[in-house]
């Protein structure tokens, strides 16, 4: 179980170019929350996740982790965060096995090869473990990146379209993992164009905060 945490969004507004996407977004995400960020294309879902991950600053407002602005505790905050964006982030020159082994080494997960074999099976890459990532499809590279979820000890997961290029069985496996993470006291925030098969899922629709 994780310690109790809270991610607070305080009066957030977001601008892209000359256009304000949303404004006055205030809400809290608490330990145990599994939330899908919704809204039409272009409303700022990815921009919001990047703000929450500390990659960009909001036009107005601030994000707080356990009551302190993330801008004042960047190192500590990022130790508590796993962010997976649109780009896979895998090292193309390394094999699938070597990429997962690298993730294992930089995480606080148990270091053993049995876990890696199990992980390769979970992400559907058994038989392709010795291929350089550069020779794999975009979907297979995405699966390597998703392997980090099973190795992560971070309580806060921020995931931009994690189901892209994933089949139905893979979506079910990932959703079960997200449910489990939330039940352990973690926080899962994601975007998805697909239906998320979870009875625990909450939804936040950015249309309610669309700038006039």
Swiss-Prot record:
**Which spans of this chain does the record mark as coiled coil?**
none
Predominant place of localization: membrane
Task: List the EC numbers from the record.
Answer: 7.6.2.5
Query: Start and end of every ABC transporter domain?
Result: 7-209
Q: Which SMART domains match?
A: AAA (SM00382)
Domain of life of the native organism: Bacteria
Tell me the Gene Ontology biological-process terms attached to this UniProt entry. cytochrome complex assembly
**Record flagged with keyword Protein transport:** no
Q: Please provide the record's keywords in A-Z order.
A: ATP-binding, Cell inner membrane, Cell membrane, Cytochrome c-type biogenesis, Membrane, Nucleotide-binding, Translocase, Transport
Topological category with respect to the lipid bilayer: Peripheral membrane protein
Q: Name one Pfam family in it.
A: ABC_tran
A single GO cellular-component term from the record reads:
plasma membrane
Record keyword Kinase present: no
The listed locations are: Cell inner membrane
Question: What family does the entry list?
Answer: Belongs to the ABC transporter superfamily. CcmA exporter (TC 3.A.1.107) family.
- NCBIfam families assigned: ccmA, PRK13538.1
Functional note = Part of the ABC transporter complex CcmAB involved in the biogenesis of c-type cytochromes; once thought to export heme, this seems not to be the case, but its exact role is uncertain. Responsible for energy coupling to the transport system.
Query: What protein name does the entry list?
Result: Cytochrome c biogenesis ATP-binding export protein CcmA
Organism the protein comes from: Haemophilus influenzae (strain ATCC 51907 / DSM 11121 / KW20 / Rd)
């Amino acid at each position: 179980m994780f310690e109790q945490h809270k991610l607070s969004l305080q009066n957030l507004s977001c601008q892209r170019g000359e256009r304000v996407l949303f404004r006055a977004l205030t809400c809290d995400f608490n330990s145990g929350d599994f939330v899908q960020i919704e809204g039409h294309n272009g409303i700022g879902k990815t921009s919001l996740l990047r703000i929450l991950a500390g990659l960009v600053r909001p036009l107005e407002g601030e994000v707080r982790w356990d009551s302190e602005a993330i801008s004042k505790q960047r190192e500590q905050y990022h130790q508590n965060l796993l962010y997976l964006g649109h780009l896979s982030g895998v090292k193309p020159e390394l094999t699938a096995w070597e990429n997962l082994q690298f993730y294992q080494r930089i995480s606080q997960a148990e270091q053993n090869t049995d876990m890696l074999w199990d992980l390769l099976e979970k992400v559907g890459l058994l038989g392709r473990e010795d291929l350089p990532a550069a020779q794999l499809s975009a979907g297979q590279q995405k699966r390597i990146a998703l392997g980090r979820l099973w190795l992560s000890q971070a309580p806060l997961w921020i995931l931009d379209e994690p189901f892209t290029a994933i089949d139905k069985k893979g979506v079910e496996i990932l959703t079960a993992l997200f449910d489990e993470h939330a039940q352990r006291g973690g926080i899962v925030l994601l975007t998805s164009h697909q239906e998320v098969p979870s009875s625990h899922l909450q939804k936040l629709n950015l249309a309610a905060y669309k700038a006039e």
